[in-house]
Amino acid sequence: MSGAPPAPRGGGHRWYGVARQLFFLVPAERIHTLVFALLRGVTAVGWPRRLLRRLLAPTDPVLASTVFGVRFPGPLGLAAGFDKDGLGLHAWGALGFGYAEIGTVTAGPQPGNPAPRLFRLPADRALLNRMGFNNLGAGALAVRLARRQPDIPIGVNIGKTKATPPDQAVDDYRASARLLGPLASYLVVNVSSPNTPGLRDLQAVGSLRPILSAVLAETSTPVLVKIAPDLSDSDVDDIADLAVELGLAGIVATNTTVSRDGLRTAGVDQLGAGGISGPPVARRAVEVLRRLYGRVGDRLVLISVGGIETADHAWERITAGASLLQGYTGFVYGGGLWAKQIHDGIAQRLRDGGFASLRDAVGSSARESG
């Protein structure tokens, strides 16, 4: 992976830059917990939530699209990992996201890896995590989803329980799909986190086929698979072909990288193992996206995630073939107005380019170059 690109200009607001400096004085997982609790508290009350939605939510009709039968008011969603248990279901629409992906959740509850397990790489505007799928379990999330009606689409990202042997992974994913499929706007099968031993081995087509087939058999909800940026090009092609063959709704590309190439933050090696998100994964995420679109075209929905910080980055992904986008690290570094800024920038570029809808822009640069 390459190092971080130059810092984006014009992104964020000065007040958040000051707040971020204060936040970054606190250990990463602790401040995440505190800020997340604050966001939930503010958006739990009707009138603040309605006010925030009025100010931040994507309402421009040019941003709306219907993807695998689900209407998304805007293409930028919150990536999996921020809200692992669906505790903030009403927060994300109020903060300007067009949808949110909850998880990763496993069939049974598990504590994840020992702390410390989340670190900032400020010189790279990146994060390093080895959380290990800490979550309350699929059953708890199912109860929460059944009780609430969020105002934006909610996807659910499912992973393998750490204690489950690889030869029992099919049953593990099947159990989560059975519980959560009827309650989610879409399901993502996560076989690409580097933080569960042996999980990435399940990306091999021979191992992946029975998992995806089992999940598809359990639910009529759209099913996607999330892949790693560290796959070889031939492995990306094989998974794309498998997804088309099985009738998946799409592919989420990409997860975090284990590569340390080109990082600028000092002392990264001392932080230990984990996946890196943010700008260091951006170049490979774009490469994988372009390869996937060239391989499958419009036969699959492509969701691009990894290193999106600005509207220019978002626009590059859309025109390269992404119907939807996701961000997590960009939100951490960009602040509460980040999603609105991205959506506003996309809307402006759609109009400047003469596109009548978001759908018209998806893959446009790939078609021109082809």
Curated annotation (Swiss-Prot):
According to its UniProt record, the EC number is 1.3.5.2
Q: Which GO terms describe its cellular component?
A: cytoplasm; plasma membrane
The pathway this protein participates in, as annotated, is: Pyrimidine metabolism; UMP biosynthesis via de novo pathway; orotate from (S)-dihydroorotate (quinone route): step 1/1
Q: Where in the cell is it found?
A: Cell membrane
Enumerate the residues binding FMN. Answer: A80, G81, F82, D83, K84, T104, N157, N190, K226, T254, G278, G307, Y328, T329
Keyword annotations for this protein, in alphabetical order, are: Cell membrane, Flavoprotein, FMN, Membrane, Oxidoreductase, Pyrimidine biosynthesis
A Pfam family reported for this protein in Swiss-Prot or TrEMBL:
DHO_dh
The chemistry this enzyme catalyses reads: (S)-dihydroorotate + a quinone = orotate + a quinol
State the HAMAP family in the record.
DHO_dh_type2
Family, according to the entry, reads as follows: Belongs to the dihydroorotate dehydrogenase family. Type 2 subfamily.
Subunit structure, interactors included: Monomer.
Q: Could you identify this protein by its name? A: Dihydroorotate dehydrogenase (quinone)
Q: What is the species listed in this Swiss-Prot or TrEMBL entry?
A: Mycolicibacterium paratuberculosis (strain ATCC BAA-968 / K-10)
What lineage does UniProt assign to this protein's organism? Bacteria, Bacillati, Actinomycetota, Actinomycetes, Mycobacteriales
